Amino acid sequence: MKVTKKVLDQSLCCTALLALVGGAAAQCALPSSYSWTSTGALAEPKAGWAALKDFTNVVFNGQHIVYGSVADTSGNYGSMNFGPFSDWSEMASASQNAMSQGTVAPTLFYFAPKDVWILAYQWGPTSFSYKTSSDPTDANGWSAAQPLFSGTISDSDTGVIDQTVIGDDTDMYLFFAGDNGKIYRASMPIDNFPGDFGTQSEIILSDTKENLFEAVQVYTVDGQNKYLMIVEAMGANGRYFRSFTADSLDGEWTVQAGTESQPFAGKANSGATWTNDISHGDLVRNNPDQTMTVDPCNLQLLYQGRDPNASGDYNLLPWKPGVLTLQV
């Protein structure tokens, strides 16, 4: 599919028109079912890399800042960011900058109370770790690693995997997966962050391994007093996302779009022709801060996809970035 700004900005256009009616900003509820349009693959891995994956994205000073994991041609993992760009159509020409130290499966956000940027990740010195910076565009300008979570889980081949961090007015929350059909949560007072969530966590969702696999993300839904969780699942037709909602970050989560035939995002509703898989990514947020706020009038999902005909070692599969835009 040819990438055009017109296609990518269609929801923003509609939102702007609605906002003009009555002179107030439009507010939208989350849809009861989802239908998307998709770009094609937006970037190719640079020489020596086989895959670009596990994306986290913020918009800062009008530009996208994207971090992700890479797999090299031997299947070894590393980390990278893209040089800042204003429009998704510019991602292909943005620089791909290797990080000197791995921050695999990252989460990037600005922690407003302390005026500091946070990059949380796995496979560091502790179960989950984080680094800080004053400049999120500099791939190698991050601090030394600090402990984010030091606990372990049982009944998991991978151990803790794929964290995300989000805050409300009083607390910060850590959510993560285990490739084992469970989603976990830990919390701390917001005044103690950045810091270590400790060793304890609780299981908040439990299902089959296939239904709750990995890549959990949690967001504040703008204007709705609601939170949205998406979790990657394994289906007959590839990876897809299921969604859940809650009234509070410490509350109960209720499935919203939970089947492969009617997912949050997957082959059944993505509109993508270049990939069957809609895998590990990040919704585009309203602002870069710890609230992880998304606009339900203008949902876009940065995801990883791959050629359906590619096979072999998972770590060598040719994952690339694409973007879904919700049809409204």
Swiss-Prot record:
InterPro entries, per database record: GH62_arabinosidase, Glyco_hydro_beta-prop_sf
Gene3D superfamilies xrefs: Glycosyl hydrolase domain, family 43 (2.115.10.20)
Molecular function via GO: alpha-L-arabinofuranosidase activity
Biological role: Alpha-L-arabinofuranosidase involved in the hydrolysis of xylan, a major structural heterogeneous polysaccharide found in plant biomass representing the second most abundant polysaccharide in the biosphere, after cellulose. Releases L-arabinose from arabinoxylan.
SUPFAM superfamilies: Arabinanase/levansucrase/invertase (SSF75005)
Family: Belongs to the glycosyl hydrolase 62 family.
Keywords, alphabetical: Carbohydrate metabolism, Glycoprotein, Glycosidase, Hydrolase, Polysaccharide degradation, Secreted, Signal, Xylan degradation
CDD domains registered for this protein in UniProt: GH62 (cd08987)
GO biological process, one term: L-arabinose metabolic process
Name used for this protein in its record: Alpha-L-arabinofuranosidase axhA
